[in-house]
UniProtKB/Swiss-Prot annotation:
Disulfide bonds join 29-44, 38-50, 43-57, 62-66, 100-162, 174-182, 281-313. Defense against chitin-containing fungal pathogens. This is Endochitinase. It comes from Solanum tuberosum. PANTHER family: CHITINASE-RELATED (PTHR22595), ENDOCHITINASE (PTHR22595:SF166).
Amino acid sequence: MRRHKEVNFVAYLLFSLLVLVSAALAQNCGSQGGGKACASGQCCSKFGWCGNTNDYCGSGNCQSQCPGGGPGPGPGGDLGSAISNSMFDQMLKHRNENSCQGKNFYSYNAFINAARSFPGFGTSGDINARKREIAAFFAQTSHETTGGWASAPDGPYAWGYCFLRERGNPGDYCPPSSQWPCAPGRKYFGRGPIQISHNYNYGPCGRAIGVDLLNNPDLVATDPVISFKTALWFWMTPQSPKPSCHDVIIGRWNPSSADRAANRLPGFGVITNIINGGLECGRGTDNRVQDRIGFYRRYCSILGVTPGDNLDCVNQRWFGNALLVDTL
């Protein structure tokens, strides 16, 4: 009888542990969970867990879906109140030119619809923090998709989102991977706003947004909502040892002593380091870095917010290897 009770007790403990682990995994949210939302009525805590007590929803404890932080009157809730359709069109003024590969693909509605899957984006902090994040996101992605040149009409920084697919004759971007195996005949070159590339980025991104991008990578270039979601996923997802772009720009990231020794301080420059630091940072003045800053300053001006400090990564050391590698 005692042996029977011991077996039952062990089974109960194992069952309880599985329930707790399952619940914990299911509740991961916010920037720690790739921008996932909590169930209705719950808040996402600053640590990335869902709940409805003060530990999750209280002032200073909540990162998204906070009390009083529900959708506003605009079409995208708080996001729509920070960037209007007319601002979007002004920022990406020449995206629909005949010379642009992405003509009539990138739209305000697609952006707003995609952002609903990442409720912390453009809705965290005060209005200045929200606008600064939007400006930074569009600056970095505009650099990746720019069709501008020095003497372009309205200047080079009015030509973001001109391109959709990587130019030239890109390869298949398919290193061997047992976790993210490439589908026959598929290529994983740069597509969309962030120009996501490689099977090891398409795979986890697709899993996070609920789309099989390993078998259908060209959805990033044919479905505008999915296209924006891939860029937002990259923006919201930490890449250890890198923080997420989101956490940096809203001021949530606290650099370690190693970061400070590497001159990686909070600001737009660290985001460039996250995205393409191995090629652009710590190498002296770089035209690509300056191009990103040029877009950022223009968008901050349109949105009516100051750009903040530490805009370049000229003296920063690269973060090094990460869970996800650079998109380009």
